[in-house]
Curated annotation (Swiss-Prot):
One of the primary rRNA binding proteins, it binds directly to 16S rRNA where it nucleates assembly of the head domain of the 30S subunit. Is located at the subunit interface close to the decoding center. GO terms for molecular function: rRNA binding; structural constituent of ribosome. Pfam families: Ribosomal_S7. This is Small ribosomal subunit protein uS7. It comes from Desulfurococcus amylolyticus (strain DSM 18924 / JCM 16383 / VKM B-2413 / 1221n). The gene is rps7. GO terms for biological process: translation. Coiled coil: none annotated. NCBIfam families: PRK04027.1, uS7_euk_arch. Part of the 30S ribosomal subunit.
Length: 198
């Protein structure tokens, strides 16, 4: 038995929040497979080490990217521990609702909420045209995560429902491709606008 194998046996399996395994998480969308990082980590906190590398975001664990999106608006900026606890509690709620590994549910939600095409403005002869373009995989993931957290935030704002429950519900709805999900609605809206400007 090699030294590496004995070390792995002593440490045990690395699990997210010490509960959910990274094994057998399937990414069905081939374009997103390379960019959804499911590398096992004890704590999803890289400290921005990816910042100065090109496409470094692709190496950041997907749960950390979700946590970073949860602490998005001004009053929550910098409160990563608060965002960490929100995601942790929402993952527990997802597990209670679905009975599945919350990581798998999150990956499915990202696949369903990631738009495939959008519009961009092109100036031609002094006139601005909106033209439909394909979206890069990293941007697809960024938009999906942004819409998931935005939907949870809107659902919890001025409402008795907590942000943890709202995030869990939004991820679960997006994973089942439910049109009641804010992220799925935004995806369909973006794709509809892109289709009309082809």
């Amino acid at each position: 038995m090699s030294e590496m194998q004995t070390r792995e046996m002593l440490i045990g399996e690395i699990k997210l929040f010490n509960k959910w395994s990274y094994d057998f998480i399937e990414v069905r969308d081939p374009s997103l497979k390379k960019y959804i990082c499911l590398k096992p980590v004890y704590l999803p906190h890289s400290g921005g080490r990816h910042e100065h590398k090109r496409f470094g975001k692709a190496l950041v664990p997907i749960v950390e990217r979700l946590i970073n999106n949860v602490m998005r608006p001004g009053r929550n900026m910098g409160k990563k521990h608060l965002a960490y606890n929100i995601v942790k509690k929402s993952f527990e709620l997802i597990y209670l609702k679905t009975g599945e590994n919350p990581l798998q549910v999150l990956v499915r939600a990202i696949e369903n909420a990631a738009p495939r095409e959008e519009t961009t403005r092109i100036m031609y002869g002094g006139i601005t045209y909106h033209v439909s373009v394909d979206i890069a995989p990293l941007r697809r993931i960024d938009l999906a995560l942004r819409h998931l957290t935005e939907g949870a935030r809107l659902k919890a704002f001025h409402n008795p429902i907590s942000i943890e429950e709202a995030l869990a519900e939004e991820i679960a709805l997006a994973a089942s491709n439910d049109p009641k999900s804010y992220a799925v609605q935004k995806k369909e809206e973006i794709e509809r606008i892109a289709l009309s400007s082809r």
